[in-house]
Regions:
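Membrane-proximal helix-turn-helix segments that form the acceptor-binding/catalytic region
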Residues: 118-139
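Conserved donor-binding/catalytic core segment of Leloir-type glycosyltransferases
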Residues: 140, 173-203
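Carbohydrate-associated surface elements
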Residues: 145, 166
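Nucleotide-activated donor-binding/catalytic signature segment of Leloir-type glycosyltransferases, i.e.
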Residues: 223-245
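Aromatic "clamp/platform" in nucleotide-sugar-dependent glycosyltransferases that forms part
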Residues: 259
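Short hydrophobic beta-strand element within catalytic cores of glycosyltransferases
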Residues: 267, 276-279
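Conserved acidic donor-binding segment of nucleotide-sugar-dependent glycosyltransferases
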Residues: 291-302, 310-316
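A short, well-ordered alpha-helix in the C-terminal region of glycosyltransferases
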Residues: 317-331, 340
Length: 354
């Protein structure tokens, strides 16, 4: 098959995150399976194993997308339209099969990023207009929580397939757990990740258990978060793959304080190294952590602090969760994910629905 992805960012973008990783890993594995792959996305773009077409700026790309699509992949078998809040509305201008891929419905995230009038318009477009325009298009959701959110905004459940991301093979295979309490969080430093909440909780935990908190990742909130951070917090920014896996292997626990997610890729990555996670019982995170098996889900900030202290002081419990995290994470491998995606794509092409 000839499969074209269309999304608003490439991995070369400074703000690239889980969505961009998902597309790239899928694309590379589909290439290995013999499919032809292209990616249409907003700039900046980088060189990839597959062809990448620059759609333009953050918002101008939505106007350019139909024109560039028609010049490049108009006759391709399938367009995978990646929904990132503001839709491309591809069913209005493409005449061949479409598959919509959605990581999460943004809901309250609109208000975190935009002023009230724009946030209301964005939320209305995603929740009311998008389901209407895409009413015949099949969807792929990356978790049960995302599928539930799609149903809530009017997408038929029988049009939704669930496909969770995989993880790469670790660049480090030997785990050398830290002898002192070491805790890690990893991800983009943006409002919905709630790193400010994590730093508040850390002040309460540190006074009881000691140790260090390492914050991996970058983003627009970094300066303000560094100013907010107390003692024994280290911001390391973006790091290489080998360093990432080394830190996952050394850490006692991964902290994930996001308000919501589509899926927690870093939770599964940490689990690959036998590192359990502690997060909130919210969409996406609850799909990535099996409560009491691969980590712990907290109900509130106070509960998070209490469970964090409990896990830091209870080595047998950490070891039990470590083994559970390793076993659960072993279920998610990119080659298997790509095979399942190829089957879903084939069904979409065969149906002829657009």
């Amino acid at each position: 098959m000839r499969i074209a992805f269309m999304s608003w960012r490439d991995l070369a973008n400074d703000q690239a995150g889980g969505s961009e990783i998902f597309i790239d890993r899928l694309a590379c594995n589909l290439l290995d399976m013999g499919h032809e792959v292209a990616h249409l996305c907003g700039g900046p773009v980088g060189e990839r194993r597959y062809e990448v077409f620059d759609l333009g700026g953050t918002f101008s790309q939505y106007a350019k997308a139909p024109l560039i699509h028609h010049r490049t992949v108009r006759d391709w078998d399938l367009l995978v339209d990646v929904e990132n809040g503001l839709p491309y509305f591809s069913p209005l201008w493409r005449r061949k099969p479409i598959l919509a891929l959605l990581l999460h419905v943004h809901t309250d995230q609109w208000a975190l990023r935009f002023p009230a009038p724009l946030a209301a318009a964005g939320r209305f477009t995603e929740a009311k207009v998008m389901p209407l325009v895409y009413r015949r298009v099949p969807f792929v959701a990356i978790s049960d929580s995302t599928a539930d959110s799609l149903v809530d905004i009017g997408v038929d459940r029988d049009r939704i397939r669930i496909l969770s991301p995989g993880v790469d093979a670790p660049a480090v295979t030997t785990v050398q757990r830290s002898t002192e309490p070491l805790f890690i969080c990893a991800g983009r430093l943006v409002p919905h990740k709630r790193i400010d909440l994590l730093l508040r909780a850390w002040e309460r935990v540190r006074s009881v258990v000691g140790g260090r908190l390492v914050v991996v990742g970058d983003g627009p909130e970094r300066d303000s978060l560094e100013a907010l951070a107390g003692d024994d917090v280290e911001f390391v920014g973006k790091i290489g793959e080998q360093e990432k896996w080394r830190l996952f292997g050394e850490a006692w626990l991964l902290l994930h304080t996001a308000q919501h997610e589509g899926w927690g890729i870093v939770i599964i990555e940490a689990g690959t190294m036998g590192t359990p996670s502690l997060g909130f019982d919210v969409p996406g995170v609850r799909d990535s952590i099996v409560d009491g098996v691969s980590g712990i889900l907290a109900d509130s900030e106070d509960d998070l602090v209490g469970r964090w202290i409990e896990l830091a002081n209870d080595r047998p419990l950490r070891e039990k969760l470590s083994e559970g995290a390793r076993l659960y994470s072993a279920r998610f491998r990119w080659d298997e994910v790509a095979k399942e995606f190829a089957a879903i794509a084939s069904d979409a092409v065969g149906s002829g629905i657009r």
